[in-house]
């Protein structure tokens, strides 16, 4: 990709490695800024170069530590706004707080996803770019444009390179059926669904498998892996019902708590995730966990937004496996 006079990309401390990969694809340098903390823990931001009139992107996931990383975005956006940046887009590969998107049974809880959307708007951000939002309808919480892109092209390319035989794509729950069905269609593979239900109170949850998995390689697809507890239980259920191998592909490697050790001792043969969230050392050293990069996809999306080109074009079937999306 060629360099652009107006485009600038800044990052905080959440995932600088991904930001460096993105700017290499764009053939530009990463914006020069100091993002640190004062002695009392408050976020300290200083822009170290001119941004007046520029088209600026802040690339930062709001993974753990979620609040610190979110505050870095907000303070950096405020600094850019006060320095007269022409347009401010925040690229949030992993959008934290997305699971708090409703009030189930009208319980007294916040809708934190909406609160974060309001905070980003109030900070002076003009546009938001995300990857695989936990729920697509969160885009409606924003009063500014949102481009929610999908890691599917990257994951599909990786799956196809593995040349897996007897493949069945598995949705880990009813809510993930649309995603799993789309992947199965792209791979010309069978589809299975895990139906989790608790027969009655104080009775262990039962996992029913809808679909034929006997002797098959089962590929579980999901948007994120958090504690990996449900994923590991699903792998046990699939193996008990005759699955030959169990693989898992997910966009976001949240890996909270004992997730990595759970995966290492589970029935899962391999977990493949993208680099929207950086891996811990434990995850990097786990031979069952492998990471692929979405830097090429993010860079092309940034380029298209900056040039006022179509983003949805990237997800047409004809171009979903295009070389411009590869690392």
UniProtKB/Swiss-Prot annotation:
What are the EC numbers? Answer: 2.7.6.1
Q: What SMART domains is this protein classified in?
A: Pribosyltran_N
EC class (word): transferase
Q: Which reactions is this enzyme annotated as catalysing?
A: D-ribose 5-phosphate + ATP = 5-phospho-alpha-D-ribose 1-diphosphate + AMP + H(+)
Q: In which pathway does it act?
A: Metabolic intermediate biosynthesis; 5-phospho-alpha-D-ribose 1-diphosphate biosynthesis; 5-phospho-alpha-D-ribose 1-diphosphate from D-ribose 5-phosphate (route I): step 1/1
What does the record give as the active site?
Answer: 196
GO-annotated molecular function: ATP binding; kinase activity; magnesium ion binding; ribose phosphate diphosphokinase activity
**Which cysteine pairs make disulfide bonds?**
none
Residues that coordinate or bind ATP: 40-42, 99-100
Role description: Involved in the biosynthesis of the central metabolite phospho-alpha-D-ribosyl-1-pyrophosphate (PRPP) via the transfer of pyrophosphoryl group from ATP to 1-hydroxyl of ribose-5-phosphate (Rib-5-P).
What family name appears in the similarity comment? Belongs to the ribose-phosphate pyrophosphokinase family. Class I subfamily.
Question: What's the name of the protein?
Answer: Ribose-phosphate pyrophosphokinase
Which species? Neisseria meningitidis serogroup B (strain ATCC BAA-335 / MC58)
Gene, per the UniProt record = prs
């Amino acid at each position: 990709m060629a360099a652009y006079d107006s485009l600038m990309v800044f990052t905080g401390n959440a995932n600088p490695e991904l930001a460096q990969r993105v700017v290499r694809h764009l053939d530009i340098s990463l914006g020069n800024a100091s993002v640190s903390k004062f002695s009392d823990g408050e976020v300290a931001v200083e822009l170290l170069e001119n941004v007046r009139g520029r088209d600026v992107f802040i690339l930062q996931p709001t993974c753990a530590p979620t609040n610190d990383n979110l505050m870095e975005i907000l303070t950096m956006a405020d600094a850019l706004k006060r320095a007269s940046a022409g347009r401010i887009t925040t690229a949030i590969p992993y959008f934290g707080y997305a699971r708090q998107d409703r009030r189930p049974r009208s319980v007294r809880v916040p809708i934190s996803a909406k609160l974060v959307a309001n905070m980003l708007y109030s900070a002076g951000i003009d546009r938001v770019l995300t990857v695989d939002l936990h729920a697509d309808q969160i885009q409606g919480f924003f009063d500014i444009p949102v481009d929610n892109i999908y890691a599917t092209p990257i994951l599909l390319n990786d799956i196809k390179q593995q040349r897996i035989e007897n493949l069945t794509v598995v949705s880990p729950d009813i809510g993930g059926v649309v995603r799993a069905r789309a992947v199965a269609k792209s791979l010309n593979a069978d589809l299975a669904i895990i139906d989790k239900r608790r027969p009655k109170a104080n009775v262990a949850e039962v996992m029913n498998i809808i679909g034929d998995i006997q002797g098959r390689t089962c590929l579980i697809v999901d948007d994120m892996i958090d504690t990996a507890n449900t994923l590991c239980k699903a792998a046990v259920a699939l193996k008990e019902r005759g699955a030959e191998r169990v693989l898992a592909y997910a966009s976001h490697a949240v890996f909270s708590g004992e997730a990595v050790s759970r995966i290492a001792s589970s029935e899962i043969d391999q977990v493949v995730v993208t680099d929207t969230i950086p891996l811990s050392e434990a995850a990097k050293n786990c031979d069952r966990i492998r990471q692929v990069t979405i830097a090429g996809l993010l860079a092309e999306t940034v380029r298209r937004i900056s040039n006022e080109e179509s983003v949805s074009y990237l997800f047409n079937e004809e171009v979903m496996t295009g070389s411009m999306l590869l690392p």
